[in-house]
Structure formats: structure tokens, C-alpha cells
Amino acid sequence: MDPILVLVLTLSCLFLLSLWRQSSERGKLPPGPTPLPIIGNILQIDVKDICQSFTNLSKVYGPVYTLYLGRKPTVVLHGYEAVKEALVDHGEEFAGRGRFPVFDKATNGMGLAFSKGNVWKNTRRFSLMTLRNLGMGKRSIEDRVQEEARCLVEELRKTNGSPCDPTFILGCAPCNVICSIIFQDRFDYKDRDFLNLMEKLNEITKILSSPWLQICNTYPALLDYCPGSHKQFFKNYASIKNFLLEKIKEHEESLDVTIPRDFIDYFLINGGQEDGNQPLQNRLEHLAITVTDLFSAGTETTSTTLRYAILLLLKYPHVTAKVQEEIEHVIGKHRSPCMQDRSRMPYTDAMIHEVQRFIDLIPNSLPHEVTSDIKFRNYFIPKGTTVITSLSSVLHDSTEFPNPEKFDPGHFLDENGKFKKSDYFIPFSTGKRICAGEGLARMELFLFLTSILQNFNLKPLVHPKDIDVTPMLIGLASVPPAFQLCFIPS
């Protein structure tokens, strides 16, 4: 038989088999657009704005639908009811971590953020317990944040009211807080090694939010066989991990098991007990990736939110004026802000909540995975299926937040000007995979922003109406555009 004919017949059979398999799977899964063989539904997704693509598809297929990202089915949950029903009402079944190829390759299933099963359960339980032991939720951690807020204010004073890019200054403060928790140390804001780390973290966020990385996560083979920005991601990730491995080595040499100093000490003393059969090198690798997760998440998410908050306050000076008026009335000029002040500052609290809602920092959270076969809303979702939860669809729900595309602290105020909670406020996600550092992040945002506005007036370099607050990238994170401003001492 003609070899070309054999090849054509073989490819045709593979094509039909692929169609049959996808059709068979789709009969069980929620509805969705018909996928093409091999490439799935990638042509129906705008990799520059995945959130809008998800919203458009939800209007056709409803709040629970199936997409094929490559050849793998992925269930998308859109809207508050679907997200809550899955992550809260069926929390155990949706507590797995879905495929995230770039991180799967970098972490090898270790650490806190991207591990699964018992590895994740043990690591999360240990991490939460240790963070509490180190003062999370207590006065001691507030003291650390207040001290760093004072350092931040002093660093901003050194700009002498001149135009500056706030990216790294605002990143140093939350980074120093998490460094003090992980390895009991902080850095000077001008330390070259420190700024190098900050630069690598900032670059990682941009790379992860780029269209190219969205494509790589859909077609993981590209990570191994194609050039691209993912190579720089792996290089930066390895640099940060190696920096932390050096800190771990220093801790091993100075460890006193009777007096644990920080997160690394607690892990070296207790953290490997449940994995006692694991080789020492694997346990140290797991520790390194765990603290890399804490270091990265504890720095970049808060610093990006702070940066976006400053940009929005420049854009809306009437909001800034109201916050500063409240700061003057409640705190004054002669003491540092503290967390007790928050309950007496409803407008400031509402402003910070509105920043987090409006910027939609991690629009689709991290991917989940169902840990067992489950019947969900009359659909069958098999074990191992990746699930994407659209936090953006919840934070921008027009029934809960009128004019959701408008920045308005009134979304979190009642008719009497009191702070109003909302179940739809889930920037840290919800359920069993909710961000472990939520409490610390909320404390940092309040204390850092109030300290800045207590001591400085924010002066933009252009008229507020000309300030663009549109994200420069929307992928894993919503990345704000670059900007400069002047911090004028008040």
C-alpha cells in the first residue's frame, strides 16, 4: 500500500478517535463550545484577556461550563453562586490543585501553593500553626508591620518630593515583613541583593501574566522545546530558591532546637516529622519551595495591591482627601496608625476593600482540581479534572456592586456611612485553598496605606483625568501600568 495513503488513513483515524473521545467526555461534563482536535478551544479564548473570554462564554453556556485547553477538559465556574457552591459547600472535593504546568515543573509537586493531597494538607497545617506561633493574628506581628511602616515612611522622605517610580519602595516593605517571619531578618531598602530579589519577583509576575505563559500552560510541551520568557521565569525562580536555600543552610549551622527563631527553624525542628521516611535532601527541597511560596506570595501580591492603590488615589483625589480627613480625625499626626483604628475608619476600610475589588488582582485564582468523582449541578465531573474559578465574575457582579467597573468606596458603605461587609468580597479566594496570609495582607494594606497618607500628599505628574488605570497585563495577575509620582511631606 502507498505509504502516503497509510499516513493519511492513520491521521484520519487519530482525528476521528480524538473527536469520539472528546464527544464521549463532553457527554458527562457541563456543556461548552465544541473543541477542535488537539488544540481544543484555544481559538475561542483571548489570551490577553482571559476573564472577558470566560464572561462571554458564560453568557452562552451558563455559570458552569467546560473548555478544552489543549486536549484536557477544564470546568469553569462563573459567578458567586457557582464558586461558593464548589469551594465552600463542596470544599473537600474541590480542594485539589489543578494543572499549572510552569509551576508544576518548577516545584515538582512540593511546597504550599502547588502541592496536592497529603503533602498539601500536612504543609498547610504546619504552615498555619507555625505562622500563629510566630505571631500571626497577634500584637507581635502588628508591631513588626508598624515598624516596617515607619521605615517605609522614612524611605519615602528621602525622595524629597521628587518624581519617583514607587514599584520597589512599595515592594520592600511587605517583603521585609515576610523576611522577618521566614528567616528573622530585614534588609535596607538600598541593599543591592535585596533589590535584585525584588526585581526578579516583579519580573516573574509580569512573565506569569503574559499571553505567552497562558499559551505555555495550555501546551506544556512548549516549556521544554521552545524559547521564550518562560526560560527567564525558571531562571528567576531558581535564583530566589537558591537564595533561600542559603538561608536554610545558615539556619542549620546555628539551630538551637529549644529556641526556634523563625519559620525555617520551626520546620527544621518539626516540619519533617510526618515525612520521616523521605530523604533529608527532599525535605530540605520541600522546605525551600515552601518558603519560596511564602516569600513570593507574601511580597508580590501585597506590593502590587499597594502600587495599584496609590495609582487609584492619584486618579481619584476626592477619595484621597476623604481618607486623609478620616486619618486626621481618628489618628492625628503624632502617633502611628494601629489596627484598632480600623473600626473607627469606615471610609478608609471601604477604600482598601474597593481597591482590592476593583483591581481584581488574581482574576481566576489558582486552578483547582476535583479530588474525587462528583455530581455537581446535575453534571458529572471526574476525579482529576482541573477547575477554574472566576473570582473576577464575583468581584465585578453588578447585582452586588452597582457600576462594578467604577472605582467607588461606596460599594462597601451603607446609607449611614458605616462599613458594609460583602460575601462577594473574595480577592483571597474562599474555601479550603483560601490564601494562608490573608490576615497579614489585610493588616499590611491598612497600616502601610494609612501611614503613607498620614505623612504625605500624593502629587501626580499629569492631570488625574489623564491617568490610565487599565492593567498593562491580565494573566495570572492584573499588573498595573508603570507610573511616577511625588510624595510631598504634609
From Swiss-Prot:
Its main location: endoplasmic reticulum. Heme binds at C435. The keyword GTP-binding does not apply. SUPFAM superfamilies: Cytochrome P450 (SSF48264). The modification N6-acetyllysine is found at K249, K375. One of its GO terms (biological process) is arachidonate metabolic process. Keywords: Acetylation, Endoplasmic reticulum, Heme, Iron, Lipid metabolism, Membrane, Metal-binding, Microsome, Monooxygenase, Oxidoreductase, Phosphoprotein, Signal. Its cofactor is heme. Pathway: Lipid metabolism; arachidonate metabolism. Its EC number is 1.14.14.1. One of its GO terms (cellular component) is endoplasmic reticulum membrane. The modification Phosphoserine is found at S127. It catalyses: an organic molecule + reduced [NADPH--hemoprotein reductase] + O2 = an alcohol + oxidized [NADPH--hemoprotein reductase] + H2O + H(+); (5Z,8Z,11Z,14Z)-eicosatetraenoate + reduced [NADPH--hemoprotein reductase] + O2 = 12-hydroxy-(5Z,8Z,10E,14Z)-eicosatetraenoate + oxidized [NADPH--hemoprotein reductase] + H2O + H(+). It is a peripheral membrane protein. Liver. It is found in: Endoplasmic reticulum membrane; Microsome membrane. Pfam families: p450. GO terms for molecular function: arachidonate monooxygenase activity; heme binding; iron ion binding; oxidoreductase activity, acting on paired donors, with incorporation or reduction of molecular oxygen, reduced flavin or flavoprotein as one donor, and incorporation of one atom of oxygen. Residues 1-20 form the signal peptide. A cytochrome P450 monooxygenase that metabolizes (5Z,8Z,11Z,14Z)-eicosatetraenoic acid (arachidonate) to primarily produce 12-hydroxyeicosatetraenoic acid (12-HETE). Mechanistically, uses molecular oxygen inserting one oxygen atom into a substrate, and reducing the second into a water molecule, with two electrons provided by NADPH via cytochrome P450 reductase (CPR; NADPH--hemoprotein reductase). Belongs to the cytochrome P450 family. This is Cytochrome P450 2C37. It comes from Mus musculus.
